[in-house]
Regions:
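Hydrophobic positions on the long internal alpha-helix
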Residues: 84, 119-123, 127, 173-174
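Rossmann-fold cofactor-recognition segment
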Residues: 48-64
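Catalytic loop of short-chain dehydrogenase/reductase
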Residues: 89, 93-108, 128, 132-182
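C-terminal helical subdomain
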Residues: 168, 179, 183, 190-219
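Conserved glycine-rich Rossmann-like NAD(P)H-binding loop of the short-chain dehydrogenase/reductase
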Residues: 27-42
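A glycine-rich helix->loop->beta "capping" turn
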Residues: 72-85, 91-93, 101
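N-terminal Rossmann NAD(P)H-binding glycine-rich loop of SDR-like oxidoreductase domains
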Residues: 13, 17-22
Length: 219
């Protein structure tokens, strides 16, 4: 009998983690959804079919918490086939330079960038035990400098300094890791899960076309 592939999805405030987890379940993955704080509480209350995957409370800014998650994966599965770095936070909507608080910027970077680096460092040995390991870092068009300098782009005038720069940094980090991992079997790439049709941050959902693109990455 073929062993199921094992995936970890990280989740914070954008609500997409459960969507990714369900897609993976439908494609015969064993899934661990690592969620923090309010997200964990909300997901815990849903019950029912939710628990087809393992829900694990995680502080992505804590090495101790991530080490506990790694221990769970090691003891239960002994490997990791897919890591989806989806956890993110956003603040500072519409803020001008005088309104930016450095502590708020640091908070965003802790989850959106530093946690990604930390979890890849920690989980790399587990990924190396997979036959075809893959890492998908969830990014955003707001971190795409080419798009943000295009006045025709619907988000071009958004002032989200912490979030946008954290995603731009994530894009560069992923590019550098792609070069580093190229000689190995680990595949790493960015993926933007949100279709930008209505120009609003209030509706975070995966459209059918985007969903198909995501499925193509996990097969």
């Amino acid at each position: 009998m073929k062993t199921k592939r094992v995936a970890v999805v990280t989740e914070a405030g954008n609500g997409l983690g459960k969507t990714f987890a369900n897609i993976l379940l439908n494609h015969e993955y064993e899934v661990i959804l690592a969620a923090s704080k309010k997200s964990f509480e909300n997901l815990s209350q849903e019950g029912g079919a939710l628990h087809d995957y393992k829900l694990f409370k995680t502080d992505f800014t804590s090495l101790e918490s991530l080490t506990e998650l790694k221990s769970l994966i090691t003891s239960k599965f002994g490997k990791l086939d897919l890591l989806i770095n989806n956890a993110e936070i956003a603040n500072g909507f519409g803020q001008k330079i005088e309104q930016i608080r450095i502590e708020d910027v640091k908070q965003v970077y802790e989850t959106n960038l530093f946690a990604v680096i930390r979890i890849i460092q920690l989980f790399k040995p587990l990924l190396e035990k997979s036959d075809a390991p893959s890492i998908i870092n969830m990014t955003s068009a707001l971190g795409d400098i080419d798009k943000m300098t295009d006045e025709n782009f619907c988000y071009a005038n958004y002032c989200m300094t912490a979030y946008a720069t954290s995603k731009a940094a994530l894009n560069m980090f992923t590019h550098l890791q792609c070069k580093e991992f190229k000689p190995s079997k680990i595949n790493i790439q960015n993926f933007d899960p949100v279709a930008l049709k209505n120009c609003t941050h209030n509706s975070v959902s995966i459209k059918d076309g985007i969903k198909d693109d995501f499925i193509a990455l996990i097969k």
